[in-house]
Amino acid sequence: MASEEFPAAKTALEEYENIERQMGEQEVWSNPDKMRKLGRRQAQLGTIVNAYRTWLNIRNDLDAAQEMAGEDPDFAQEAKRLESELPEAEEKLRTALIPRDPDDARDVIMEIKAGAGGEEAALFAGDLLRMYMRYAEKRGWGVTIQSENSTELGGVKDVQMAIRAKGNPSPEEGVWASLKYEGGVHRVQRIPVTESQGRIQTSAAGVIVFPEADEDDDEIEIDPKDLKIDIFMSSGPGGQSVNTTYSAVRMTHIPTGIVVSMQDEKSQIQNRAAALRVLKSRLLAMKHEQEAAEAADMRHSQVRSLDRSERIRTYNFPENRIVDHRTNYKAYNLDAVLDGDLQAVIDSDIQADEEQRLASQQQQQ
């Protein structure tokens, strides 16, 4: 039977099988860095390969059944069944072949900063921190707090954390695939604990998310001459000294002006390594934004730029309501969302993004 051959899927299968062979070689499996890179690429190809193998098996079985259909009615019946299954398998393969964000399988660095609203904004930033930590826990991800500046009332002025999956997840299961939509301004409406008149106050917190670079990521190279490194004493809430050693690190990338501070690790060496990894992650995100802009892919650029001024979500406590302003998602389970039941909200963003990618793909065909 005449059928599209999907050369892109065939190429993906060949690369996937080549990676399998490489991962069986001692010089590769004995090198954790190479194994991690190959494992991530294999996971990226896995969705396409699985869909292609399913489609290919159905098509080949259908060809064989149709050849025998004239001699055996059982084969004729089997051919009808396979023929009915082929369109769905083909559609799943076409969907798998739609270009994804190449960073979907990566882990992330997330920053939460209290906005206008004083102590109430800091308390809300703390609520967001707990929400993301609970969500990560439900997904089986690990969270590492890299730096935190808290208030005396338990709020958070700013916090930075790494959220990491276990192993090599498929792109759709990657941390970045879900949390990249969280960047922007989150607005809260509630009666502050410091409000004696019972009036509802509006305040906000900003969330910044970017994919985490690998320690040995060769996509980004940093010249040591481009770094200015300052060492200072770690501090806790209200400027209290955490220890008596100068272990905190402030790293400035001179060409871009990006500044990264790290103080939560136990030693200066560990803080320096952690700061360098965050800096590489920021530069990687900047590089991908520039590439998206040069390719004139404005939708992709808008997703990746994570505009700090964009109000993306409102959390209304009196009505127990949450609204995502990009997708018009609305639900009255704010208490559950703040306890980490965030998937339905994120799914609305993922669905909207997939619809845009599909529409863009169809326009190009």
UniProtKB/Swiss-Prot annotation:
Keyword field: Cytoplasm, Methylation, Protein biosynthesis
A GO MF label: translation release factor activity, codon specific
Gene3D superfamilies reported for this sequence: 3.30.160.20, 3.30.70.1660, 6.10.140.1950
Main location: cytoplasm
GO cellular component, one term: cytoplasm
Residue ranges the record marks as coiled coil: none
InterPro entries on file: PCRF (IPR005139), Pep_chain_release_fac_I (IPR000352), Pep_chain_release_fac_I_sf (IPR045853), Prokaryotic/Mito_RF (IPR050057), RF-1 (IPR004373)
Pfam families per UniProt: PCRF, RF-1
Modified residues (N5-methylglutamine): 240
Matching NCBIfam families: prfA (TIGR00019), PRK00591.1 (NF001859)
Protein name in the entry: Peptide chain release factor 1
Organism: Bifidobacterium animalis subsp. lactis (strain AD011)
Gene name of the encoded protein: prfA
